[in-house]
Amino acid sequence: MKVVFVSYEVFPFAKVGGLADVAGTLPKYLKKHGVDVTIVMPKHRIVEKNAEKFGYEIKKVAEGLSVSHVKTDQKFDIYESVLPGSDVKTYFVANDYYFSAEDVYAGPDLGEQAIFFCAATLDLVKHLDLKPDIVHVNDWQTALIPVYLKTVYRDDPYFSRTATVLTIHNLGYQGVFDPKYLSFAGLPDYVFTIDGLEFYRQLNFLKGGIVFSDVINTVSPTYAEEIQTEEYGEKLEGVLRMRSKDLYGILNGIDYELYNPATDRYIYVNYDVNRLELKWENKVKLQEELGLPVNKETAVAGLISRLVPQKGLDLLVDVMDYLMLFDLQIVVLGTGDEQYENAFRKFQERYPDKVSANIKFDVELAQKIYAGADIFLMPSRYEPCGLGQMFSMRYGTIPVVRYTGGLADTVKEYDPQSMEGTGFGFKKYDSAHLLKAVSKALHFYYREKDHWRRIMTNAMNTDLSWDRSAKEYVDLYKKALAKVGR
């Protein structure tokens, strides 16, 4: 089975969010399950910069190629590399006009950029003769590929047996643009209807992918159900319900080789489930590095997140003053909306011995927080899957979450009777319930140390690997092939 896996970001070539982790890991595990997978992504400026840092080579293999169907004179080149730690070939669509911004999700025109990349990807596939059985696209930036295949390429024998899979990592980002982009894309007018890409008189790229893909999945079973409701559907619940028989939920995994406290080169002291006492050495070193009072007994809670409303930060801001009444230090890492960046900076000014606000993106510090914290906070308003809680569990750091989406599928409330469970959480979206959940976690941390150690052990022994997920994706590909009569 040949799969072309298309993503706007892939770790370590370019990373902004969790999509990069998925796209940089799932293909490796698909390969282990016998799938012949090739990655295609844009050649962002950061790709060249990361080459030396992450030890990969990148070379040009074609240049000056025209883009079919799109009304543009822009050409593209093809570059090639190999995904580090694997033999997965990765091809890059290179164009200095569209992909020269420092930010992966920036550029002169995001609509044109996505259209150009989608169309160029299909030209790349034909130019390199990749002969895919499956084209697997991710999020709105790549969602027009199934639209192209089902319309302007419908009678092209090269793609006649190719099936499409769309993975929705976050329904909140849809790629909604003026209808004029339809002409630029070279797509037929008939797709701009209520049953196609039309969305409140605008053009919705993600909706196009939902309508035209053979099968669709999102990144947790709970989120697949949630997005068919008005509360979580982001005005697409109707079309998602129409495709419900082709809509699946597959939990993301994490790379157990990369995220392993026993071998992680970024953390201060390596440890494993049988040497948990070494974890506290990471806490002390983290406190030292961040200028917090050093005390291995004091509970440390970590928050590693984009600082945006989706992440439930309004709840945390509401209860920060109350949390400061506990023997608790809070370490924040992330960037995002100015209101949240400034809020956490002010909390650090107000509580310099209890709050460390690190308003930046720092992979090394993130690993140190996963290893050095006792508690990990994820009070998300919604969470398609979430990777932070998986990383934290892998490192024995106990998640306190809102039970929504993938958080509900991965974190199980600890039951002191059965001694089963991996964390703590709450369902109702309000600050009082968050405060209660954190308070409960702190009770076990300070007063039920045997139970706390059991929760850590449970968390670290939970199977959150990509191996499990990859098997489910292979099954999903078979369902997609069945849709095209294979």
Swiss-Prot record:
Signal peptide: none annotated. Keywords: Glycogen biosynthesis, Glycosyltransferase, Transferase. It is an enzyme of class 2 (transferase). InterPro entries: Glyco_trans_1 (IPR001296), GS/SS (IPR011835), Starch_synth_cat_dom (IPR013534). The keyword Chloroplast does not apply. It catalyses: [(1->4)-alpha-D-glucosyl](n) + ADP-alpha-D-glucose = [(1->4)-alpha-D-glucosyl](n+1) + ADP + H(+). SUPFAM superfamilies: UDP-Glycosyltransferase/glycogen phosphorylase (SSF53756). Coiled coil: none annotated. The gene is glgA. The lineage of its organism: Bacteria, Thermotogati, Thermotogota, Thermotogae, Thermotogales. GO terms for biological process: glycogen biosynthetic process. NCBIfam families: glgA. GO terms for molecular function: alpha-1,4-glucan glucosyltransferase (ADP-glucose donor) activity; alpha-1,4-glucan glucosyltransferase (UDP-glucose donor) activity. This is Glycogen synthase. It comes from Thermotoga petrophila (strain ATCC BAA-488 / DSM 13995 / JCM 10881 / RKU-1). Synthesizes alpha-1,4-glucan chains using ADP-glucose. Gene3D superfamilies: Glycogen Phosphorylase B (3.40.50.2000). ADP-alpha-D-glucose binds at K15. Its EC number is 2.4.1.21.
